[in-house]
Amino acid sequence: MIYSDKLKELREEKNITQQELSNILKIDNSLFAKHEKEYHIIPINHLNTLCNYFHVSFDYLFNLTDQVNYENALENIDSIKAGTRLKNWRKENKLTQEKLASMLNMARSALANYERGRNIIATPFLYTICTKYKVSADYLLGKIDELVDLK
């Protein structure tokens, strides 16, 4: 599971209902319930809203670290900065677009669009990169500027 256990735990700690969170995200309650159980994957922009609401990092929500949040983390995701970070990270790890796209089981053109900042990387692709290579989601998304050690 990518985030479902942590998300439910955060929601229950704050005594917040699924309905309240669905209102914050401006989505139907039944859709949020499916998101929380990971029947549907939550888009990055909604995860960012939840991370900001609960004052936690993506890395914490993805269970990549026990550190709840990062000092001086930005609230918003800049798609251009995120794309540049992804491209630079890929090159530093000596991966071609073709190789990374193949590993993620996606089209190379979709990866190119992420790297150009046309789209924010999809949640499952981000999670796969972060878990396989132990790289911070918050760093790749441009929310923090320093690489952190992950478990």
Task: List each language-model region with its residue ranges.
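Short, structured motif recognition centered on aromatic/hydrophobic residues
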Residues: 7, 41-44, 86, 97, ...
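DNA major-groove recognition helix of helix-turn-helix/homeodomain DNA-binding modules
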Residues: 45-60, 124-139
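A short, Lys/Arg-rich alpha-helix, primarily the initiator
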Residues: 1-13, 69-92
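Alpha-helical residues within the helix-turn-helix
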Residues: 12, 23, 52, 91, ...
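Short amphipathic recognition helices of helix-turn-helix/homeodomain-type DNA-binding modules
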Residues: 60-70, 139-150
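Short alpha-helical DNA-recognition segment
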Residues: 15-34, 94-113
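Residues in the helix-turn-helix
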Residues: 20, 31, 41, 57-60, ...
